[in-house]
């Protein structure tokens, strides 16, 4: 699979915001060197066991969600690739009826594996507005 087709499949991630993380988890490498620095903060997860558990937890937080993506940059060199994007989320917290929104800056790294391109790192944060130090 070419790299562009891989990142187009990231739209499968919308199911993650509806309590079904399996499609997004399938885009990840299941190797011991994957890392996740998620938008909810906390520790940086290392290795597929920790990352997979965190993705399950994240999926359980959402219902009725959508994710609109603004792609900023994407490229590859050899067996590595990267993707930089802004993600605009609309969702309900699981068990609640009020709609919420969040916007994240996201950087993902990919590696070409025998099964195709897989995510090996994702970093997301909500610092989308420039702020001077205080």
Predicted region positions:
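Short, low-complexity N-terminal intrinsically disordered segments enriched in polar/charged residues
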Residues: 1-27, 79, 131-134
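A short, hydrophobic/aromatic-rich structural module that often spans a beta strand
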Residues: 88, 127-134
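Short beta-strand edge/turn micro-motifs at domain boundaries
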Residues: 82, 103-130
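Generic short beta-strand segments
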Residues: 85-92
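Generic alpha-helical structural signal
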Residues: 4-11, 49-52, 56, 105
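Generic structural detector for well-ordered beta-strands
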Residues: 73-75, 90, 109-111
